[in-house]
Amino acid sequence: MTTPTPLSYKDAGVDIDAGNALVNNIKSAVKRTRRPEVMGNLGGFGALCELPTKYKHPVLVSGTDGVGTKLRLAIDYKKHDTVGVDLVAMCVNDLIVSGAEPLFFLDYYATGKLDVETATSVVSGIAEGCFQSGCALIGGETAEMPGMYEGEDYDLAGFCVGVVEKADIIDGTKVKAGDSLIALASSGPHSNGYSLIRKVLEVSKADPQQDLAGKPLIDHLLEPTRIYVKPLLKLIEQSDIHAMAHITGGGFWENIPRVLPDDCKAVVKGDSWKWPVVFDWLMTNGNIAQHEMFLTFNCGVGMVIALPTEKVDAALALLTAEGENAWLIGEIATRQGDEEQVEII
């Protein structure tokens, strides 16, 4: 009788040594994100974090998100260093809408076969996003699952927790007719609409390496999502913010109403800002209607802020000083009956 060959976890497709190599590779990047509230070091069963002592009645705010099919482009064109920033941005930009300061972040990286170099690049991007937003990368999960993913494919998910003073929560209840709307510029499509973007590339048979306004089209499409946390925390301290809307999936039509009272609508002047060239390219090459553009993409606006009209000039000056491109794009008006809550004129 032949003795069966002894099997190992590695024979089944899971390389523990590769996982350990990844942890060693990312230690310095993760350490850079540490906050004073974090207790212990990377690698424990559970990550510990104290609440900052400056809060009298702290309220925790949580969010989870992914990068969607933008990952498909990143994988196909082997550009893995920015999707980690995207992952963090999608979470922390949701938290700041409530006025919350991000505290800590955890990531989930899943793949069929762990490529240490690729994973190091991705997680380093996650650490960079955490650094930009001032939150600690305190843990995560790297799942190597043979048979679950094809080839070099991987998927990402992120989870973030922030904190806000209970009395300072921004929830849209203060919004009223006469408020002004400020927009913060996006860096591109951010992390939404990529299934349509990929369809436009397929139908138009465009070369993603073609030049568009001085750089390859693919670089426009993979530009990382802008993180607005630090400038908005400063704005919140110095102004009276009534509401903020993170313009993600669903675009203007679906995200702005999420922070408006039922008796209010947003009137947006569509010519008050210039679309980044990548959106013009998508609209033309995909023959996409303008309504569909505003439903699918941010069209150059990553965040919309509602505030009293008398606060606009100071807010624009502060945001500009913080390196943001910001514009006055409209106002809040009284909604009549069952009118749409967003009107683009």
From Swiss-Prot:
Which pathway does it serve?
Purine metabolism; IMP biosynthesis via de novo pathway; 5-amino-1-(5-phospho-D-ribosyl)imidazole from N(2)-formyl-N(1)-(5-phospho-D-ribosyl)glycinamide: step 2/2
Q: Which PANTHER family match?
A: TRIFUNCTIONAL PURINE BIOSYNTHETIC PROTEIN ADENOSINE-3, TRIFUNCTIONAL PURINE BIOSYNTHETIC PROTEIN ADENOSINE-3-RELATED
GN (gene name): purM
Q: Name one GO cellular component term.
A: cytosol
- Say which family it is in: Belongs to the AIR synthase family.
> What is the catalytic activity of this protein?
2-formamido-N(1)-(5-O-phospho-beta-D-ribosyl)acetamidine + ATP = 5-amino-1-(5-phospho-beta-D-ribosyl)imidazole + ADP + phosphate + H(+)
Q: What is this protein called?
A: Phosphoribosylformylglycinamidine cyclo-ligase
Question: What domain of life does the native source organism fall in?
Answer: Bacteria
Gene Ontology BP terms: 'de novo' IMP biosynthetic process; adenine biosynthetic process
Question: Mind telling me which Gene3D superfamilies this protein's record contains?
Answer: PurM-like C-terminal domain, PurM-like, N-terminal domain
Quote the HAMAP family the UniProt record gives: AIRS
Where found, per UniProt?
Cytoplasm
Q: Any idea of its EC number?
A: 6.3.3.1
Q: Which UniProt keywords apply?
A: ATP-binding, Cytoplasm, Ligase, Nucleotide-binding, Purine biosynthesis
> What GO terms are given for molecular function?
ATP binding; phosphoribosylamine-glycine ligase activity; phosphoribosylformylglycinamidine cyclo-ligase activity
Query: CDD domains, per this entry?
Result: PurM
InterPro entries attached to this UniProt entry:
PurM-like_C_dom, PurM-like_C_sf, PurM-like_N, PurM-like_N_sf, PurM_cligase
Q: Which SUPFAM superfamilies match?
A: PurM C-terminal domain-like, PurM N-terminal domain-like
Looking at its record, which EC class is this enzyme? ligase
- Just give the chief location class: cytoplasm
